[in-house]
């Protein structure tokens, strides 16, 4: 019998392998390689938003109060966009605008770019987290694919749209009332509700809500009779592996209701994935179009006839007048640096007035 004496054949681990072992170790909160992007970015985005809504004014950028310190509440506080004069500057704390002065940086709107970019990369990190965990447990990456929808909307609205305009100033501020104002701005300046990409987005989101409600109700409807009571939560364990509802019964039910029904669970759930994600992506594509001021539907013939005939008016022409009113009021308020003045006689009036 021969005994081999010498070095072990096992090679010492390198830095990458050691980091990989530590990052992907089984723990209560999985970290992973994606966590190197997700956790710092999410921390800074949320921390920047809480700091801004609590302490930072928008007086120097919008002429507004926007913090709890100034008397705002949860619905009216916001981290507002930088001034229009700062264009597309990244507004780095150490950049030429703030020159390392934290107070001045906050006054100029530096927290907005800070929250926007850390938020975008945080969302991307969360998508990568879903991909990484799915790969480690041998799942398909459809969760990560689905999450590209919210990422596309965030990036298109908060980053691409203002990049197509004159500056970050025209992006939404990070606050409830601030985003509502941005929605009104989108309608007044882009007639967004008549844009077919917006229509597809609405169909996707509301259609997904309808599908979700129908699916949940159908599963509850077809639960096996496994106890004496009518209560859904009796006679079964919430963690059990066995199914407690009948797909065949659900299929019969919807075949009677509509005449058609999903033939298998895979097609049903793919459809529930496809509808909202496609809607979100279509709305994101539409916002990218608005970034370069693409028009959607303009029914000019109706506008000309309404201008010539006092008795002719449609819901479209009324909405066009409403948009003109939004622009007339919003432009002067939102862009005081332009010194816009609209005389009373040029403000829009409908034929009914």
From Swiss-Prot:
EC numbers on record: 1.10.3.9
Protein origin, superkingdom: Eukaryota
Molecular functions (GO terms): chlorophyll binding; electron transporter, transferring electrons within the cyclic electron transport pathway of photosynthesis activity; iron ion binding; oxygen evolving activity
Any one Gene Ontology cellular component term annotated for this protein: photosystem II
Cell compartment(s), UniProt: Plastid, Chloroplast thylakoid membrane
Reactions it catalyzes: 2 a plastoquinone + 4 hnu + 2 H2O = 2 a plastoquinol + O2
Predominant subcellular localization, coarse grouping: plastid
Membrane topology: Multi-pass membrane protein
GO biological process: photosynthetic electron transport in photosystem II
Membrane-spanning parts: 41-61, 125-141, 153-166, 208-228, 279-295
The UniProt record lists the keyword RNA-binding: no
Cofactor note: The D1/D2 heterodimer binds P680, chlorophylls that are the primary electron donor of PSII, and subsequent electron acceptors. It shares a non-heme iron and each subunit binds pheophytin, quinone, additional chlorophylls, carotenoids and lipids. There is also a Cl(-1) ion associated with D1 and D2, which is required for oxygen evolution. The PSII complex binds additional chlorophylls, carotenoids and specific lipids.
CDD domains in UniProt: Photosystem-II_D2
UniProt miscellaneous comment: 2 of the reaction center chlorophylls (ChlD1 and ChlD2) are entirely coordinated by water.
Assembly mode: PSII is composed of 1 copy each of membrane proteins PsbA, PsbB, PsbC, PsbD, PsbE, PsbF, PsbH, PsbI, PsbJ, PsbK, PsbL, PsbM, PsbT, PsbX, PsbY, PsbZ, Psb30/Ycf12, at least 3 peripheral proteins of the oxygen-evolving complex and a large number of cofactors. It forms dimeric complexes.
HAMAP family with a match to the protein in the record: PSII_PsbD_D2 (MF_01383)
Family from the record: Belongs to the reaction center PufL/M/PsbA/D family.
Biological role stated in the UniProt entry: Photosystem II (PSII) is a light-driven water:plastoquinone oxidoreductase that uses light energy to abstract electrons from H(2)O, generating O(2) and a proton gradient subsequently used for ATP formation. It consists of a core antenna complex that captures photons, and an electron transfer chain that converts photonic excitation into a charge separation. The D1/D2 (PsbA/PsbD) reaction center heterodimer binds P680, the primary electron donor of PSII as well as several subsequent electron acceptors. D2 is needed for assembly of a stable PSII complex.
The protein, known as: Photosystem II D2 protein
């Amino acid at each position: 019998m021969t005994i081999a004496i010498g070095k072990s054949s096992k090679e010492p681990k390198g830095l990458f392998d050691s980091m990989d072992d530590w990052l992907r170790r089984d723990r209560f909160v999985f970290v992973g390689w994606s966590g190197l992007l997700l956790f710092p970015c999410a921390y800074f985005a949320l921390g920047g938003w809480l700091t801004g809504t609590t302490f930072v004014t928008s007086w120097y950028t919008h002429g507004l109060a926007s913090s709890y310190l100034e008397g705002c509440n949860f619905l009216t506080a916001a981290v507002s966009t930088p001034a229009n004069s700062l264009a597309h500057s990244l507004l780095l704390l150490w950049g030429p605008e703030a020159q390392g002065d934290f107070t001045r940086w906050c006054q100029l709107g530096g927290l907005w770019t800070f929250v926007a970019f850390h938020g975008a990369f945080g969302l991307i990190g969360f998508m990568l987290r879903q991909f990484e965990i799915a790969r480690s447990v041998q799942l398909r990456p459809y969760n990560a694919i689905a999450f590209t929808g919210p990422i596309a909307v965030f990036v298109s609205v908060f980053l691409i749209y203002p990049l197509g305009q004159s500056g970050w100033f025209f992006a939404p501020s990070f606050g409830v009332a601030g985003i509502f104002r941005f929605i009104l701005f989108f309608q007044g300046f882009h007639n967004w509700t008549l844009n077919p990409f917006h229509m597809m987005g609405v169909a996707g989101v509301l259609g997904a809500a309808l599908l979700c409600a129908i699916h949940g109700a159908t599963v509850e409807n077809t639960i096996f009779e496994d106890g004496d009571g009518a209560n859904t939560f009796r006679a079964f364990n919430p963690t059990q592996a066995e199914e407690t509802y009948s797909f065949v019964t659900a299929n019969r039910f919807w075949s009677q209701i509509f005449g058609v029904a999903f033939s298998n669970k895979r097609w049903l759930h793919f459809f529930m994935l496809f509808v909202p994600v496609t809607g979100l992506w279509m709305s994101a594509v539409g916002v990218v179009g608005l970034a370069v001021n693409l028009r959607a539907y303009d029914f000019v013939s109706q506008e000309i006839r309404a201008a010539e005939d006092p008795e002719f008016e449609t819901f479209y022409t009324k909405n066009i007048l409403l948009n003109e009113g939004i622009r007339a009021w919003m432009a002067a308020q939102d862009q005081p640096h332009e010194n816009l003045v609209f005389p009373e006689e040029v403000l829009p009036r409908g034929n009914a007035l």
